[in-house]
Amino acid sequence: MVTVRVWDVPTRLFHWALVLCLLGLVLTGQTGGDAMVWHFRLGYAVLTLLGFRLLWGVVGGHWSRWSRLPLSPASAWAYWRGRAPLHHTVGHNPLGAWSVLALLALTALQAGTGLFSDDEIANAGPLSPLLTGAWVSALTAWHKNLGKALLIALVALHVLAIAWYRWRQGEDLLTPMLRGDKVLPAEVPASRDGAWHWLRAAVCLAASAAAVRWLIGLG
């Protein structure tokens, strides 16, 4: 058994930056008023992070790539029966992979609907002028009510799952996302995590930020 780099620095920074942004969005959304300026800024930051993760899933570290997610029904069934191969549990296990995709998709939907929302008082998303009043009202209702509730519930479920794995399975999922490493058999491939790797991440982040800037300027 050896120490293997599973989660590279860019992946870990993305993860914790997203956590902080989501916490900030909940707080600023509940506070309202002048805090909504930061609510919008954090929303743009979330869109930038999601765009980065989309790109990083293609060019990032070995275990951060979309191709490494065990998403087939057969993988989930084998994991449920305790017969999953090692490479299906090094990064995200099959159930965790689907949970992560659902969380990212719902976060993207919530951030996207925020671009079109309008509280009809003082705050309007930059793309709200592009839609009719009926569509804006519908998307605003989703964003402020069901969408927010679903996202908070899914985040809570994610946290509970991490605690359950620690308590019942004895598997620490939190420390590897902090330090990046797991103790694994020597044959398990490691994720690259050096200066050139970080430069590639910076390019992906810059490209995502430029895309978000262009998007919010469409309104």
Residue ranges and their predicted role:
Residues 1-219:
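Membrane-embedded alpha-helical bundles that constitute the cytochrome b-like, heme-associated redox core
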